[in-house]
Amino acid sequence: MSKKPVMLMILDGFGISPNKEGNAVAAANKPNYDRLFAKYPHTELQASGLEVGLPEGQMGNSEVGHLNIGAGRIIYQELTRITKEIKEGTFFTNKALVKAMDEAKENNTSLHLMGLLSNGGVHSHIDHLKGLLELAKKKGLQKVYVHAFMDGRDVAPSSGKEFIVELENAMKEIGVGEIATISGRYYAMDRDNRWERVELAYNAMVLGEGEKASSAVEAIEKSYHDNKTDEFVLPTVIEEDGHPVARIKDGDSVIFFNFRPDRAREITRAIVDPEFKGFERKQLHVNFVCMTQYDKTLECVDVAYRPESYTNTLGEYVASKGLNQLRIAETEKYAHVTFFFNGGVEQPNTNEDRALIASPKVATYDLKPEMSAYEVTDELINRLDQDKYDMIILNFANPDMVGHTGVQEAAVKAIEAVDECLGKVADKVLEKEGTLFITADHGNAEVMIDYSTGKPMTAHTSDPVPFLWVSKDAEGKSLKDGGKLADIAPTMLTVMGLEVPSEMTGTCLLNK
């Protein structure tokens, strides 16, 4: 007998904006989406700010979006949690942070603070770095060095100089800290095993090798002069009298202040992992603190903010009912439909199958806007024909990953490719008498230009996202307004005929 699968399709970075200018979502020819939108119930969901556990007005992101969707409740993010602790003062007694600083003081070694320098709030926040500098000052440390990763992706592409100036002013005011290196996140924060990039960032921080400059401002200005925006700044060593300001050495303390794990793992492994094989390097012995848990299998690090655990996430609850589920995405978003969707748990649930389709190896995704969407779709159709799954979670990475390039024509092509795939998937699910919910985790591709400057916009947005209910049972029915991402899981469970567990505080969006 054919199963009637309930599927959630997440169009990553597909937001809704009334403004048509620079809007790749509106500009794209998407007959399949339009057809489903016209025929089936739909509403808009909030995917940013307090509705997803972020600070008010903070744009959403993929990690946060998938956590909220999978948990069926608002998940207070590390960003909100750490900022709150700095305000309340408990940050300054955090055991792991205090221990790393005390050891640097006792052993007369250096403290290195590394991470993404911006207020983007996706991977890090400059205020957390300022908090660490204040703590270092309180502890009486003098040898404190910052290894700044330049952003240009979650914030404007050439805003890095402003953040460097802001940091230098803060260090002056607090009375401690010097910038030792700067590197574009393209190098320091790779997540796709492109070790030749990571090696350049590592060499700057540890060996003092790479581009040279007499100040961080000089380094970033040179980069702009060479037409390299923040994300692509070549790893640069800041020198004084012909010598590096500082290098990470044996016995030093290192605090990595990024709170989002996925782009923090590779450079961390390069520094601390005794089994590291990415490139040739000598083993360092440092006191290393990760702001959050980047990887459970890394035992040689301390963690400042351990993950909170969540019971009865959507995947766990469906598994407890003896049902089969599938998670499917290409490499760029695979962690999102598995690890993040499961509330930060790496281990699959019972009867949870996973299909990983490799993302194309291109320098930037505007060069291949369709990415691996067609391959993901082919694999999904094959799996649907097996009649095995009760629930399927699917992610199309294109609107987000191509949206990040700032190239509008490419983002339009990305959405058109996804629409083609969406049509095939919807037809197959309807053929199986199943239900397809279509949504997004946050906005991006609907705003491809910065309206204040007219320049390309590469960051996420705070726009709402669509929520469509595609099913024979849905015709003529309606969905509630005023929803948020946390309402999706209770809605799916209701359609599956399952009771919503008490831990899920989201609301079912079906109008009775």
UniProtKB/Swiss-Prot annotation:
It catalyses: (2R)-2-phosphoglycerate = (2R)-3-phosphoglycerate. One of its GO terms (biological process) is glucose catabolic process. Its EC number is 5.4.2.12. GO terms for molecular function: manganese ion binding; phosphoglycerate mutase activity. Signal peptide: none annotated. Keywords: Glycolysis, Isomerase, Manganese, Metal-binding. Mn(2+) 2 binds at D12, S62, D441, H442. Its cofactor is Mn(2+). The active site is at S62. It is an enzyme of class 5 (isomerase). Pathway: Carbohydrate degradation; glycolysis; pyruvate from D-glyceraldehyde 3-phosphate: step 3/5. PANTHER family: 2,3-BISPHOSPHOGLYCERATE-INDEPENDENT PHOSPHOGLYCERATE MUTASE. Monomer. This is 2,3-bisphosphoglycerate-independent phosphoglycerate mutase. It comes from Clostridium perfringens (strain ATCC 13124 / DSM 756 / JCM 1290 / NCIMB 6125 / NCTC 8237 / Type A).
